[in-house]
Amino acid sequence: MTTDVISADLKTVLRRLKLGRMLDTLPERLVLARQQKMPHQDFLTLVLADEASRRDSLAVVLRVQRGHLDPALQLDAWDATAKVTFDRALLNELTTLRFLEAHAHVAIIGPVGVGKTFLAHALGHIACRRGRTVLAMRTDHMLKTLKHARLDNSYDAEVRKLLAVDLLILDDFALDTLDPTESRDLYEILTERHRAGSIIVTSNRGPDEWLITFADPLRAQSAIDRFTSNAYDLVIEGESYRQRLKPTLKSAAP
């Protein structure tokens, strides 16, 4: 099989146009074009489609990284034999991301270890693959970040980050009792994103227990009412899923 030599001039031009990665597949595409006597336009379409596909894949990787999503927590890695129960039809509906289109929210509720974070991140991965921006973080980490941001006058910038993404995932929501500043910050995020951007929360508590974690009952009632009135509740029950994620020793070869 004849291997086409890519000229130095072509390499230079491709790199100037930021198309240098096309060189990875260009030789084999040239061979294919010769074998199939491919018209020039079809060949150009083929190599540009390769580049578009590569850029799309890279964009997904970057969205996942910037969103702080766990690479291992994807729906195709979910253990279907796990002894947990939840509304599968609702999960299937959520994977369509129609809730994102409607700026609706999701509350994933259940005891410790049943896979709440797993499913939240799995939905985040689906969103990234479909071109949406995501940010996942623990609720306490978000509130600490906002508290520290007040000290260096970066508070407004941090809030903009939380409001700008298509999907905000808050893990361990309503886990701890909030002080007045934290209550106010959480109120701001929940109300500003109401019907403007979707939120997924994971929580060990049901929505009826969230109110007691806020320092300000009036703000709490307002924020929680906005959220719950526009949220799907995915309730998970059963044994700990987390044990299935434990590392295990592989059997040594005989």
Predicted regions and their residues:
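Interdomain "pre-motor" coupling segment immediately N-terminal to P-loop NTPase/helicase cores
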Residues: K11, L19-D70
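Conserved P-loop
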Residues: A89-A164, L211-T213
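Solvent-exposed alpha-helical segments within well-ordered globular domains of core cellular machineries
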Residues: A8, T12-R15, D24-P27, T45-L46, ...
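Walker B motif beta-strand of ABC-family P-loop ATPases
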Residues: L167
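N-terminal pre-Walker A segment at the start of P-loop NTPase domains
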Residues: L73-T95
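Intrinsically disordered, low-complexity and often Lys/Arg-enriched segments
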Residues: M1-T12, P247-P254
